[in-house]
Swiss-Prot record:
Ligand binding (pyridoxal 5'-phosphate): 58-59, 184-186
Entries under Pfam families matching the protein: Aminotran_5
Protein's UniProt name: NifS-like protein
Annotated localization: Virion
Length: 383
């Protein structure tokens, strides 16, 4: 995806240990119970409290949980079940809930973002007498900020909370942000075809047969893929933490300079001199519905990028700005532009690319004068 707000392209580099891990898994040295216990330990979960099912992906795990919760409610009551979902949830959550709603099997409420997060108070206000499930991811899928799962769980007061927590797990932040009732994890590398659905046993009441099939779930576990997922969880975290550092630093820098990089109403690129800009024309924040959300674009790809990103994350508010104009406005030396464009346009980044990006971000954060604008004589370069 071509967006600096989603650095998923950084995750695409397959580690050297992965083929070896797959071969180790094929040898079948460890039973399935070993991987269940180890993955729960890595998440800081008590193995005695959780039931775990390995699935084909987190998408399958999400669908299992939603379908089971809705069916359990329909079997118990005459009311149509109500599901709460957060804005920017994975498509496997939103599409499943919307499909059930179209078939009149449930109704749903989407909780909007507040400062890139799901507000627990908004979740509380959305609760109805027929609410059977809340689906709130551990991180915002757009900008990777953490949602307060424990606070959300408290306001739900017994209503199950299901979370997609892959980002938290691979960044090593899951112990500080543990899932509340049930969770799903996806393999870091999609071709392994492995996902995890875990849930507290107290939530299992009435859900077990609907999800686990009474022990009759077809097929055998993908042990090689599960072993590789376990190895990835234990070895990939240092690079994931570095990626998370890059992202946080970039977001911090964007917020620091947002009064400079946000579009200025009624002022063209040729008129962006300090003499021609009135203070009242410079916005101090982005659109109220989604503060500071910026989609960087280059040339004619702007509309295409907006459509892809806004459609995928169900976002209807945002701004497109010219990347080159921003780089010049905050006086980023031209030798760094190529590196920043890597974040924008390339799907796969190497370790060297990451190092170069870190250099640029440190330059942005420590050297760049706050609010600096280009002199008039250079403005025409970006028209």
């Amino acid at each position: 995806m071509a967006s600096i707000l989603a650095l998923d392209g950084l995750y695409a580099e397959v580690p050297k240990f992965l083929p070896e891990a797959l071969r180790e898994g094929c040898a079948g040295k460890n039973p399935l119970s070993f991987y269940i216990q180890q993955i729960l330990n890595l998440m800081g979960c008590d193995g005695n409290e959780y039931h775990v099912l390995f699935t084909g992906s987190s998408e399958e795990a999400n669908t299992h949980m939603i379908m089971a919760a809705v069916r359990r409610h329909l079997l118990r009551t005459q009311q149509r079940p109500h599901v709460i979902i957060g804005a920017a949830e994975p498509p496997s959550v939103t599409e499943c809930v919307k499909a059930l709603a179209q078939e009149k099997r449930c109704v749903y409420t989407i909780i909007p973002l507040k400062n890139f997060e799901i507000d627990p108070v908004a979740v509380y206000d959305a609760i109805q007498s027929n609410t059977c499930l809340a689906c709130i991811s551990g991180t915002n899928a757009v900008v990777k900020t953490f949602n307060k799962l424990q606070d959300i769980s408290k306001v739900l007061k017994g209503i199950p909370l299901h979370s997609e927590v892959s980002e938290l797990v691979y960044q090593g932040c899951i112990k500080q942000n543990p899932p509340a009732d049930s969770f799903s994890i996806n393999s870091l590398y999609g071709f392994l075809g492995v996902g995890v659905l875990g849930m507290k046993k107290k939530v299992m009441q009435g859900l077990g047969p609907l999800i686990f099939g009474g022990g009759l779930r077809g097929g055998s576990p993908n042990i090689p893929g599960i072993h590789a997922m376990y190895r990835t969880l234990t070895q990939q975290r240092p690079s994931m933490k570095k990626i998370n550092t890059i992202h946080k630093l970039f977001m911090k820098t964007l917020k620091k300079h947002q009064h400079v990089y946000l579009p200025i109403g009624g002022v063209s690129a040729e008129d962006t001199s300090a003499e021609n800009i009135s203070t009242k024309d410079i916005p101090v924040e982005g659109p109220k519905e989604l503060p500071g959300y910026i989609l960087f674009s280059v040339g004619r790809r702007a509309e295409e990028l907006q459509k892809k990103i806004f459609t995928k994350f169900n976002i209807k508010v945002g701004r497109i700005v010219d990347l080159q104009e921003i780089l010049f406005r905050i006086k980023i030396p031209q030798k760094y532009w190529e590196t920043l464009l890597f974040i924008q346009l390339r799907d796969n980044l190497t370790k060297e690319d990451i190092k170069r990006v870190m250099v640029v971000l440190m330059h942005l954060d420590t050297i760049t004068p706050r609010g600096s604008l280009p002199p008039p004589s250079y403005s025409s370069s970006f028209s």
